[in-house]
Amino acid sequence: MSSMPNHQKVVLVGDGAVGSSYAFAMAQQGIAEEFVIVDVVKDRTKGDALDLEDAQAFTAPKKIYSGEYSDCKDADLVVITAGAPQKPGESRLDLVNKNLNILSSIVKPVVDSGFDGIFLVAANPVDILTYATWKFSGFPKDRVIGSGTSLDSSRLRVALGKQFNVDPRSVDAYIMGEHGDSEFAAYSTATIGTRPVRDVAKEQGVSDEDLAKLEDGVRNKAYDIINLKGATFYGIGTALMRISKAILRDENAVLPVGAYMDGQYGLNDIYIGTPAVIGGTGLKQIIESPLSADELKKMQDSAATLKKVLNDGLAELENK
């Protein structure tokens, strides 16, 4: 942690499209007084630092620079976006073996620097890589957080906002489970202005089939974006900024993140997307949603899918 009072330091590892979008979002919001960018492509990190520096006159003063893993020593937060990108036709789980190797080369030097803050992981497959970060680092589980279903939940709220012509910020709805193909919309707990989404839907002639189609569109939106422009980055960059803000400002905000399961939903020893309280010490509390029987089965099936891929990936890494 930074030794200066009220001086917060963030280190970003990975300056690709997602990382640079996150850095821009942090600069725009004026969050953290010191922001370090680490990547194997040094010219890019130096260029981004110089470019972001130019925004300070319009936002807030901030020390922004290209750095090394040693700069993590006194950081409050290390955000990992580094990894091989998802290609058209490739699932997030297809990325596991490539990105486990990359992650193992990142976490060790961060920890060796003396870092004692919070890890926030966004590289895909994020649930598996968050678990691996926890394992590789030896950190307490509450100080290793994944972006989880934060982006997916935003997509759901935007889609429901469009469907019912309301501000998506007035929609309280969560995508849960894997950040990927086995995720699901927890419609049983979703509300619009305190009213259950299913009640609002019924009044407006929106059927369960329509809601299922909307959910499927949310699940596949990443693939639509990837097919059109090659990658997703603005949405996830903003989601990471929101989680970072909750941590650095000790907000105790309820956000959908990748959290370690210790009996919740009947699950153990896995990171998966769920609402949780996020603040200055990391993940403070998991909000165990009262899911329907069908949704609980989807949550457990999603976890089983993740656990199999996780175990296979870690076993392969150990055998190398």
UniProtKB/Swiss-Prot annotation:
Pathway the protein contributes to: Fermentation; pyruvate fermentation to lactate; (S)-lactate from pyruvate: step 1/1
Family annotation (Gene3D superfamilies): Lactate dehydrogenase/glycoside hydrolase, family 4, C-terminal, NAD(P)-binding Rossmann-like Domain
A cellular component term, taken from the record's GO annotations: cytoplasm
Keywords assigned: Cytoplasm, NAD, Oxidoreductase, Phosphoprotein
Keyword flag NAD: yes
EC number: 1.1.1.27
InterPro entries in the cross-refs: L-lactate/malate_DH (IPR001557), L-lactate_DH (IPR011304), L-lactate_DH_AS (IPR018177), Lactate/malate_DH_C (IPR022383), Lactate/malate_DH_N (IPR001236), Lactate_DH/Glyco_Ohase_4_C (IPR015955), NAD(P)-bd_dom_sf (IPR036291)
Active site (UniProt): 179
Family, similarity comment: Belongs to the LDH/MDH superfamily. LDH family.
HAMAP family linked to this entry: Lactate_dehydrog
Function in brief: Catalyzes the conversion of lactate to pyruvate.
Protein name: L-lactate dehydrogenase 1
Annotated source species: Lactiplantibacillus plantarum (strain ATCC BAA-793 / NCIMB 8826 / WCFS1) (Lactobacillus plantarum)
Upper lineage: Bacteria, Bacillati, Bacillota, Bacilli, Lactobacillales
